[in-house]
């Protein structure tokens, strides 16, 4: 069987088209007037998941020592990417979910704030990490994740997402970081 190019399936479908074709559109979720893009059908399709992971890590190959996933769907991507690149996986969790010594970072939500945490001993200072998540919206969550690693002395090699909601300008929260998004809406 032929190997596919990064970002394409074996049928040579560009990864953005593949994601768009599998992504489910759910009107009025989580509240009326919102059109939710559900990526779980992409993750449920083995060939699509492989294409997504390959396309996310390809631009950063050899530039990271571990892959971090942001709770919760980022865990799926990070675990697959870490396995594919023979690196470790790091979890960035919501507050109160990690049992050992943590560092915390607050970030703004539409109505309030939230907190992310990271075990301080998971990556030594000087390490390099690739941060993955499913969606880049306002950039609050991914910006907080990047700040956590930087505060631990870990270099953020890049940030990768499956889908970017361009109108929300999330990249502005990631200024100074390389961002890879596979589908921009």
Curated annotation (Swiss-Prot):
It comes from Arthrobacter sp. (strain FB24). It is found in: Cytoplasm. This is Adenine phosphoribosyltransferase. It holds the Pfam family Pribosyltran. The gene is apt. It comes from the Bacteria. Pathway: Purine metabolism; AMP biosynthesis via salvage pathway; AMP from adenine: step 1/1. GO terms for biological process: adenine salvage; AMP salvage; purine ribonucleoside salvage. Signal peptide: none annotated. GO terms for cellular component: cytoplasm.
